[in-house]
């Protein structure tokens, strides 16, 4: 079985392969998020405590938290749930997918562990090396929270603290910093004012067009009523003339 061991304090990760069943027996029948002592893995892991974060079996089916079985089950999953990506599906569509339970069994090929407590000895590549966290926050409000800034302070110069310097393919030395999102500048305020002015202009135009339409509709209805009243008057005159003619003939 392979072990993916991660150390959050140093940001390092290492993969180990252990074939001895006696060493692996300490992890069997344990659930995800349970803590296991590393003494069973060997003398170098003495004093270490690991937390089980997940794993997958030899066919690549992942373990799912909350499924209390050591075997494989088929669950009806929707988009956003663990073990189901859901890309290319319709909204609300669910699919039945095979997942493995959250209990560790010998069928697993990879087990993901996190170091909760450091032991006596250093593990090479895990605890003796520290990788710097290069990626800081991008959002302006989170940068302010990180450096304890007020709204009046300029956020842009604080991003330089985690600016990255590297050499590109042409051999030139370049520096790179994340683009700050949701940064309020005079240009963004100007664009906001322009959007509001454009919206007001559209509303005024719609109101004037609606008023013109109502005016035109009223004139058309008046013309229609006038034509109808004229046709009714002509009809009445024809009927009265015909009635007078029949009365004179009968007399």
UniProtKB/Swiss-Prot annotation:
Keywords: Phosphoprotein, Ribonucleoprotein, Ribosomal protein
Alphabetized PROSITE patterns for the sequence: RIBOSOMAL_S6E (PS00578)
Compositional bias per record (Basic and acidic residues), positions renumbered to this chain: 220-233
GO biological process: translation
Ranges annotated as biased composition (Low complexity): 239-251
One annotated GO molecular function: structural constituent of ribosome
Function of the molecule: Component of the 40S small ribosomal subunit. Plays an important role in controlling cell growth and proliferation through the selective translation of particular classes of mRNA.
Stated family: Belongs to the eukaryotic ribosomal protein eS6 family.
Name of the protein described by the UniProt record: Small ribosomal subunit protein eS6
């Amino acid at each position: 079985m392979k072990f993916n061991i991660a150390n959050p304090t140093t940001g390092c990760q290492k993969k180990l392969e252990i074939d001895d069943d006696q060493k692996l027996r300490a992890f069997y029948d344990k659930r995800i998020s349970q803590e296991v002592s590393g003494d069973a893995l060997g003398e170098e892991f003495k004093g270490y405590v690991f937390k089980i974060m997940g794993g997958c079996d030899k066919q690549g089916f992942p373990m799912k938290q909350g499924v209390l079985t050591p075997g494989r089950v088929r669950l009806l999953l929707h988009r956003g749930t663990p073990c189901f990506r859901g890309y290319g599906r319709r909204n609300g569509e669910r699919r039945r997918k095979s997942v493995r339970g959250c209990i560790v069994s010998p069928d697993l090929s990879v087990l993901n562990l996190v170091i909760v407590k450091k032991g006596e000895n250093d593990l090479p590549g895990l605890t003796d090396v520290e990788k710097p966290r290069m990626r800081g926050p991008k959002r302006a409000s989170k940068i302010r929270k990180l450096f304890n800034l007020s709204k009046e302070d300029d956020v842009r110069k604080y991003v330089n603290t985690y600016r990255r310097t590297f050499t590109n393919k042409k051999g030139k030395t370049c520096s790179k910093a994340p683009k700050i999102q949701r940064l309020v500048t005079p240009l963004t305020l100007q664009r906001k004012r322009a959007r509001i002015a454009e919206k007001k202009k559209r509303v005024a135009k719609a109101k004037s067009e609606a008023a013109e339409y109502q005016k035109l509709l009223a004139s058309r209805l008046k013309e229609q009523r006038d034509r109808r009243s004229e046709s009714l008057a002509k009809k009445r005159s024809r009927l009265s003339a015909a009635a007078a003619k029949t009365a004179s003939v009968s007399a």
